[in-house]
A protein has these predicted regions:
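Phosphate-group recognition and catalysis centered on beta-loop-alpha active-site segments
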Residues: 1-123
């Protein structure tokens, strides 16, 4: 049996952030499940929902912002006051980090509201 950290160590840290992924690694899990979305300029970012309102300090949809714009978005969610600014990571940033450890990664492609034709090819 393998134990996966859902959205990283999301029970104690802001979900789908590099902090949550690092803490999941430190906890000894076997893998990480994460969610991806596509930005306005075609970059793959790690965030659960298509919309930003619930988990960030931005409003609207991920697909309406460029990566540059989203880099100033705080994905700290309910943990903002505890952990400060937590940027939305790119899938590339995650892959670079994950290449240095032995975690298994389960990528969930989110498309319940919008279909992203290129998302599968980019992940």
């Amino acid at each position: 049996m393998k134990v996966f950290a859902h959205r990283g160590f999301s029970g104690r840290y802001p979900q789908n952030t590099m902090l949550a992924f690092q803490k999941a690694l430190e906890s000894g899990c076997d893998g990480i499940e994460l969610d991806v979305q596509l930005t306005k300029d075609g970059e793959v970012v790690i965030i659960h929902d298509e919309y930003l309102d619930d988990l960030t300090d931005f409003t609207g949809n991920v697909r309406d912002y460029t990566l540059g714009e989203l880099k100033s978005c705080n994905a700290g969610g309910k943990w903002r006051e505890v952990y400060g600014f937590q940027p939305i990571p790119t899938f590339e940033e995650y892959c670079e980090w994950a290449s240095g450890n032995s975690l298994i990664t389960n990528v969930e492609i989110k498309s319940s509201v919008y279909y992203y034709e290129q998302l599968e090819k980019k992940t």
